[in-house]
């Protein structure tokens, strides 16, 4: 944004008013509104559009290929004959090997602001009063936006409103693109845009960099939310504008990545948790209503002997007919005959054949909660468990 002191803005506004007063007589003689002629030549076909106080008309005429050339801006002196239509403004803009030359014919009472850029760039024209600004490209609908208020041209080349000091339009060297939602109008309709009051001048066109499509193939966004859309109305007197917050249509959605599904093992870890799981005990008993499982095959074989009644391990001691399902049971039985007791109590020197018998005996040496002196001298009362299978 460019700012100027209030005194300079008032001085320039006074100069504009004096210039307009000098040409007021010429304006009274001219009854028709300024005619804006925009033509585009691409070598095949073109459109000639004119705006006046009557209904607009669209005429087709062939283009010529001789219009190719470098950008040129020419403004005739405002002192020529009024009947000729006023100062002539021609602006040939080459783009992609084609030439199109919008021409604006104005009355002498109108103010013309021109901005000449380098050859790769395009020229923009802004008129004071209820004038029209041509922005065109071959085979693309034109945009006509009226603007009211006093304008001035600072040294930097951007037209600035004299009331607020805000630049009216900025552009880059890239080719312009039409606003989203614009459409050509028939001969009985008028394309009308939002008017800007002179008391609050504002930017009427966003920058061309915001209007251009993105260069990145992945960035498919449309122009930002401040881009405006125009409504086509049947009446010439109606001026309707959509809210500035409306976003451009047809916003494509970025294809999001596919949701990654994490498959979790619903089965418990083998060897953890309960030991009776089928994974930890692969050897199962097939007898009816049994369902027991074991980690070793030998344990399953000894278990199945209970179902069959087989006792392969028999005692060879004289006059002993005991037999057992497992070999360890037979060895434990032989201690009855040999009186071998490997498990001895360290407090009372008693001996036992099995470790579980020793643990059961050691509980008698521990004082109880009710009678601490109980079971202190009951070592003689304790008798070893009966020998058996």
From Swiss-Prot:
SMART domains, per database record: ZnF_C2H2 (SM00355)
Zn finger (C2H2-type) location: 283-307, 313-337, 343-365
Keywords: Activator, DNA-binding, Metal-binding, Nucleus, Repeat, Repressor, Transcription, Transcription regulation, Zinc, Zinc-finger
Primary localization class, coarse: nucleus
Matches recorded under Pfam families: zf-C2H2
One GO-annotated biological process of the protein: regulation of transcription by RNA polymerase II
Biased composition regions of type Basic and acidic residues, renumbered to the chain: 264-278
InterPro entries: Znf_C2H2_sf, Znf_C2H2_type
Gene3D superfamilies given in the database record: Classic Zinc Finger
Biased composition (Polar residues): 26-38, 372-381
A cellular component annotation (GO) from this entry: chromatin
Start and end residues of each stretch annotated as Disordered: 1-48, 239-279, 356-389
Subcellular location as annotated: Nucleus
MF-aspect GO terms: DNA-binding transcription factor activity; DNA-binding transcription factor activity, RNA polymerase II-specific; RNA polymerase II cis-regulatory region sequence-specific DNA binding; sequence-specific double-stranded DNA binding; transcription cis-regulatory region binding; zinc ion binding
Function: Transcription repressor that binds to the promoter of target genes and prevents their expression. Acts as a negative regulator of epithelial-mesenchymal transition and metastasis in breast cancer. Specifically binds the 5'-CACCC-3' sequence in the promoter of ID1, a key metastasis regulator in breast cancer, and repress its expression. May be a germ cell-specific transcription factor that plays important roles in spermatid differentiation and oocyte development.
Full protein name: Krueppel-like factor 17
Taxonomic source organism: Homo sapiens (Human)
